[in-house]
Curated annotation (Swiss-Prot):
This is Protein YIPF5. One of its GO terms (cellular component) is endoplasmic reticulum membrane. It is a multi-pass membrane protein. The chain crosses the membrane at residues 126-146, 148-168, 173-193, 196-216, 236-256. It comes from Xenopus laevis (African clawed frog). The gene is yipf5. The keyword Acetylation does not apply. Pfam families: Yip1. Its main location: endoplasmic reticulum. GO terms for biological process: endoplasmic reticulum to Golgi vesicle-mediated transport; protein transport; regulation of ER to Golgi vesicle-mediated transport; vesicle fusion with Golgi apparatus. It is found in: Endoplasmic reticulum membrane; Golgi apparatus, cis-Golgi network membrane.
Length: 256
């Protein structure tokens, strides 16, 4: 026992007293700061987040199936270009077909003495010329003349020649589409000549006189439109001569 007392005395520090152990210590004196701490468990917190997300996902749907509560907001692209077919322009407008301008150009050709509107005639409109070319070929077909290839070939060569000639004569220049449009619209009187060829034969004095009048009508209308669109004052006769040569070929196809 004496050895044990010596051991205890040697083990503790000299300033430490065993009697101090009898004094009680209040763990609650420090408040929540000295409360019991548990070790960190990352899986427990992760499980809490998962349960919270599951509770949020399992909330009942308060809206209706066919009437969702959240409205659709279009993107910036859809706001600019439109998201429905109602916002799109008409198909004829996208193709560049304007029936008002087609009618005005047709009236300009049918009235040779009428002043042509250069702003309208300077447009590239090939819808009317294509219709008139098909109508001219159809009337020739009714007369027993299958000349669609000649009509298209002569039209292409004539438009190309007039395009080169007008670019040399005018100061502003002209596009190939504008030349084709004007020459195609001025083909309308030639359809009248081919229609007469269906009713009676044009191989005579009456046919020659009628063909000459139609050629003068077509060439005068075309030259008037070119002069108005290209501001070529005083050069109408110079423009009318090659136009008369072109429409003379169509007249020969209609008569013979």
């Amino acid at each position: 026992m004496s050895n044990f007392d010596n051991f205890n005395t040697d083990f503790y520090q000299t300033s430490y007293s065993i009697d101090d152990q009898s004094q009680g210590y209040n763990y609650n004196a420090g408040g929540a700061q000295y409360s019991k701490q548990y070790p960190y468990d990352p899986y427990s917190q992760q499980g809490g987040f998962i349960l919270q997300e599951m509770n949020q996902q399992q909330q009942p749907y308060t809206g209706q199936i066919y009437q969702p509560t959240q409205t659709y907001t279009p993107t910036a692209t859809e706001s600019v270009y439109g998201s429905t077919f109602d916002d799109e322009p008409p198909l004829l407008e996208e193709l560049g077909i304007n029936f008002d301008h087609i009618w005005q150009k047709t009236l300009t050709v049918l009235h040779p003495l009428k002043v042509a509107d250069g702003s309208i005639m300077n447009e590239t409109d090939l819808a009317g010329p294509m219709v008139f070319c098909l109508a001219f070929g159809a009337t020739l077909l009714l007369a027993g003349k299958i000349q669609f290839g000649y009509v298209y070939g002569i039209s292409a060569m004539g438009c190309l020649g007039m395009y080169c000639l007008l670019n040399l004569m005018s100061m502003t220049g002209v596009s190939f589409g504008c030349v084709s449009s004007v020459l195609g619209y001025c083909l309308l009187p030639m359809i009248i000549l081919s229609t007469f060829a269906v009713i009676f034969s044009l191989q005579g004095i009456l046919g020659i006189v009628l063909a000459a009048l139609i050629i003068g009508w077509c060439s005068f209308s075309a030259s008037k439109i070119f002069i108005s669109a290209l501001a070529m004052d005083g050069q109408q006769l110079l423009v009318a001569y090659p136009c008369a040569l072109l429409y003379g070929v169509f007249a020969l196809i209609s008569v013979f």
